[in-house]
Every structure is written in structure tokens, then in C-alpha cells.
Regions:
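Helix-to-loop junction immediately C-terminal to a conserved catalytic motif
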Residues: 54
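Conserved ABC transporter NBD signature motif
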Residues: 62-73
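Conserved structural motif at the start of ABC-family nucleotide-binding domains
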Residues: 8, 23-25
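ABC ATPase nucleotide-binding domain helices that frame the ATP-binding cleft
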Residues: 47-50, 146
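ABC ATPase nucleotide-binding domains
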Residues: 84-86, 90, 94, 99-233
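Non-catalytic connector elements of ABC transporters
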Residues: 252-341
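The feature captures the beta-strand-to-loop junction immediately N-terminal to the Walker
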Residues: 39-41
């Protein structure tokens, strides 16, 4: 998907609480109509980013622009209500004393409510039958829809979603995630989603920034992040790869699983995704199956070499492997990066 218009740019954002640095020189470009993901573990600074973009938190330094208009720097700080940015909080932040309709109407003027926009958003978010109910009578998924509808109702330039599906069970999270993405695409709404869920980030977002200790480690398409991580840290953030140590000479790196091409020289980390290892039963094979975990759609095979090192491969569920089986392997793809990156 190609995006041509830059809607938001943040440069050099920093934030500390006392001696604890939460964000260090954070930069971001958001394109109109895109869904941008910020992926990071708890405490990485991702929620702080959203709060600064929305205007609820003041950066220590840096600048934020929307359509080339400054909304924050050391001289200017546009208040949240004038930034035209909607926010969906992790806990939804619905008003318990207001029904669904009044919760959604909260950010609309009387004129906007009477224009039909309120009922349009209620219908768009499949909430018509619930509009007279109060939040405490709704399921988690329904409350999430109300929070999203309230954020979308004023037609903001973008919406920010803070861990939007964390509190839902896995099945409901998948269903609602698909609904939300479909709605964002349909309305051409620009969105930033922060999440710790790698599957969510990869499947939903057009661009993903991996955040670690307040720093963006890599920002790229989901495919680029997954297939070409620039460090072991990024590789681990979007999967569970086998990380091997090796030393490259003349473009070849030797590892415990074989010799591979490398664009780098010297000490390297070699990342091999489990799905990039094909295994076959072989009574004379150099590897031994240690464990098999069956997931239905596939299975993860843990195997060991004669040095006692353990590796993982993903395999189709049709072949049954037993502990102690001898196997041989074939590696289809690897990613290498300098060990000291």
C-alpha cells in the first residue's frame, strides 16, 4: 500500500521521570490513511509516546507537527482538545453513568449530534441495539466498540489506540481486531496502535516501529521487520528464532547448523526462523528429536546436535516425530547481523 501525504512528524522527543529515562530521541513519521504500529514490551515507553502525541503528557524536548503545523515544541503546546486526535484507552475510559449513545455523543457538539453523525457512528460500529445500555452491562468487546465509536465520532485526523485488545480473550481479540482494522480502512482513518503482541503488530500495521528502552531500534514494514531484523533484539521481538553465533570469513559464516552466506564479516549473530528449517526422518541423521509440541495447524520440533545444543523447527502436522528420532535438516533462509550491533 502506497501513502503519499505525511500527516504527523515527531522529532527528538525525550521524556524522563526523575532519573529514569522513558523516551530517548524518539522520531516518527505517520502517513495519512496508514495504520502505524509501535511494538514494545511493558515499560518500553510506547504508552508515553501516545500520551505525548495526544497532548496528555508534555515532552522534555523535541517537536511534533501535524500537516507541517507545530502542535508542540518548546514555545508551543496545543491542548489535547484542539489537536483533533482521538484516543482509545486501554481501559476504555467509558463514563459509567452514561449509556452507550451518550458516551459516544460526549465529544460531539449539539449540531453534530443532530446532523446524523451520532447515529451514523453507532450503526457503523454495530452498536444500534446497545445504544441505551450502560457500560457495565456490556461485554469487553462491546465496550471496546463504544470506545472506538467515541473516538471516531468527531472525525479526527487520526486515532491512537493503547493496547486495544489486551483485556479480551484470544478469540474475541482476533474477531474485534479484524472489525477495527476493516473500519479504519473503510473510513480511511489514520491510526497508531501500540502493542506488545507481535502477531497483532505484524498482521494489522502498514509500518511497525520496534521500541526498546525508549529507543526505536528498527522501523519498517512488517515483512522487513520479520525477514530482515537488524539485531537479535528485533528478531526476538517478532518471533522466536534460533540465534546462533558464528564468524564470517570471505562472505561465509560457520554455525552449528551449517555454513551460510553473509553480507558481514567477523563475529555475527545468525537468526534462523523455525519455519525456515525443514526436517526429515533419517536413521543416520546427526540430530536427535528432544520434544514435539503439536498445535494442530503445525508443530514445533525441538532437536539437539551432538554438542547438546537445542534448536527449534516448525513442521507440518502430518508427520509424527517421537522423542529420540534421528533427523537431518535443511535450512532455507537465514538473517545475519553483527554480534555487537
Amino acid at each position: 500500500m502506497v501513502f503519499n501525504s505525511l500527516i504527523l512528524r515527531a522529532r527528538g522527543l525525550k521524556k524522563s521521570y526523575g532519573s529514569e529515562s522513558v523516551l530517548a530521541n524518539f522520531n516518527i513519521d505517520i502517513w495519512k490513511g496508514s495504520i502505524f504500529g509501535i511494538l514494545g514490551t511493558s515499560g518500553s515507553g510506547k504508552t508515553t509516546v501516545l500520551r505525548m502525541l495526544a497532548g496528555f503528557e508534555t515532552p522534555d524536548s523535541g517537536s511534533i507537527e501535524m500537516y507541517d503545523k507545530v502542535i508542540y515544541n518548546q514555545e508551543i503546546n496545543i491542548p489535547p482538545e484542539n489537536r483533533n486526535i482521538g484516543m482509545v484507552f486501554q481501559d476504555y475510559a467509558l463514563f459509567p453513568h452514561l449509556n452507550v449513545e451518550k458516551n459516544i455523543a460526549f465529544g460531539l457538539s449539539k449540531e453534530e449530534q443532530n446532523s446524523g453523525r451520532l447515529q451514523e457512528v453507532i450503526g457503523m460500529c454495530n452498536l444500534t441495539q446497545y445504544k441505551n445500555k450502560f457500560p457495565q452491562k456490556l461485554s469487553g468487546g462491546q465496550q471496546q466498540r463504544v470506545a472506538l465509536a467515541r473516538a471516531l465520532a468527531p472525525k479526527p485526523e487520526m486515532i491512537l489506540l493503547d493496547e486495544p485488545f489486551t483485556s479480551l480473550d484470544a478469540q474475541m481479540a482476533r474477531v474485534l481486531r479484524d472489525e477495527v482494522v476493516s473500519l479504519l480502512r473503510e473510513t480511511k482513518t489514520t491510526a497508531i496502535i501500540v502493542t506488545h503482541d507481535q502477531e497483532e503488530a505484524l498482521s494489522v500495521c502498514d509500518i511497525v516501529s520496534v521500541l526498546e528502552n525508549g529507543n526505536v531500534i528498527q522501523s519498517a514494514t512488517p515483512q522487513e521487520i520479520y525477514l530482515n531484523p537488524i539485531s537479535q533484539s528485533v528478531a526476538n521481538s517478532v518471533g522466536d528464532p534460533n540465534i546462533l553465533k558464528g564468524f564470517s570469513v570471505d562472505g561465509r559464516v560457520e554455525t552449528s547448523l551449517g555454513s551460510f552466506n553473509s553480507a558481514y564479516e567477523g563475529a555475527l549473530d545468525v537468526s534462523i526462523r523455525p519455519e525456515c528449517i525443514e526436517i526429515n526422518l533419517d536413521s543416520m541423521g546427526p540430530y536427535t528429536v528432544k520434544e514435539c509440541i503439536f498445535y494442530g495447524h503445525d508443530q514445533v520440533i525441538s532437536f539437539q546436535n551432538n554438542k547438546g545444543e537445542i534448536f527449534r523447527a516448525r513442521s507440518l502436522p502430518s508427520v509424527i516425530y517421537e522423542t529420540g528420532d534421528k533427523i537431518c535438516i535443511e535450512v532455507s533462509e537465514v538473517t545475519t547481523f553483527p554480534s555487537n550491533y
